[in-house]
Amino acid sequence: MTDTTSKTRAGFAAIIGAPNAGKSTLVNRMVGAKVSIVTQKVQTTRFPVRGVAIEGDTQIVLVDTPGIFSPRRRLDRAMVRAAWAGSEEAEATVHLVDVQAELASRADKATPGEYRSAQDVQTIIEGLKAADRKVILALNKIDGIKRDTLLAVAKDFFDTGVYSDVFMISASTGAGVEDLTAKLVSMMPEGPWLYPEDQTADLPARLLAAEITREKVYLRVHEELPYAATVETTAFEERKDGSVRIEQTILVEREGQRVIVIGKGGQTLKWIGQASREELCDILDRKVHLFLHVKVKENWAEERGLFSDIGLDFDV
């Protein structure tokens, strides 16, 4: 870790936005390594994940926050509160907007998901107005959209009075991300780096392992399984030969969901385990022995222990 303060900069930048706006993809892109899980499901990020990006002598700690939406369940309320809290504590905040969903909503051609996304964007704008805050706007998913159209949308957003700067980016291809990163660099205060140079994320290994497996669950059964599953790492043992033994339990709410996760002849669970094990071997840079179990626990999302494990407030 660097210990000089004369030339180095370091600080926090929060990425907020509606579910599925592309926040995790953007953080992974800026860090240059996998920090947050990315699936076709919205609301896959359940707690703020810190990714560490380095640009020259500047270290930016990127806080990938849960999507901000209209919450119903206790877990949803805790996720939204965590998102706003992550933004309030940062030196810079980027509001990431799915411009494809915004345009579809304006043209009355939106899918239900796109319509909800546009509504959630307005909820965020109202929250920023109430807090009297100005943040950076990043219009994401600009691929294939005419520049004149993008400029018109950007003006509409800028006129709300809550944005200091506007960037047009594609988190998936990297277009425009360099300019956004340069802006964040300029906003970081002088000071020593907050993390070692080779650290890309602030996430305990047990929790990282659970997140990787949860991603594989949703990638495999995203159409059949609603947001009724979580993964707990019940054992994480570093062995003398340098390998690690990990035991995890996939919790679902109903027996029918357990059957889906296991699959015919156990093939779905086998795929999840193999995909998760391969990625964990790559991330941890060691051999991984992964053992998965699937358990029905009807009210897992209402357990206080789950909230404390992932840093969320149970009493919301």
UniProtKB/Swiss-Prot annotation:
Localization per Swiss-Prot or TrEMBL: Cytoplasm; Cell inner membrane
InterPro entries hit by this protein: G_ERA_dom, GTP-bd, GTPase_Era-like, KH_dom-like_a/b, KH_dom_type_2, KH_sf_prok-type, P-loop_NTPase, Small_GTP-bd
Keywords, in A-Z order: Cell inner membrane, Cell membrane, Cytoplasm, GTP-binding, Membrane, Nucleotide-binding, Ribosome biogenesis, RNA-binding, rRNA-binding
Protein name listed in UniProt: GTPase Era
Family assignment from sequence similarity: Belongs to the TRAFAC class TrmE-Era-EngA-EngB-Septin-like GTPase superfamily. Era GTPase family.
Region (G1): 17-24
Record region (G4): 140-143
Start and end residues of each KH type-2 domain: 221-298
Region (G5): 169-171
Highest rank taxon of the organism: Bacteria
Gene: era
Molecular function terms, GO-annotated: GTP binding; GTPase activity; ribosomal small subunit binding; small ribosomal subunit rRNA binding
Sequence ranges assigned to domain Era-type G in this UniProt record: 9-190
Biological process according to GO: ribosomal small subunit assembly
Binding site for GTP: 17-24, 64-68, 140-143
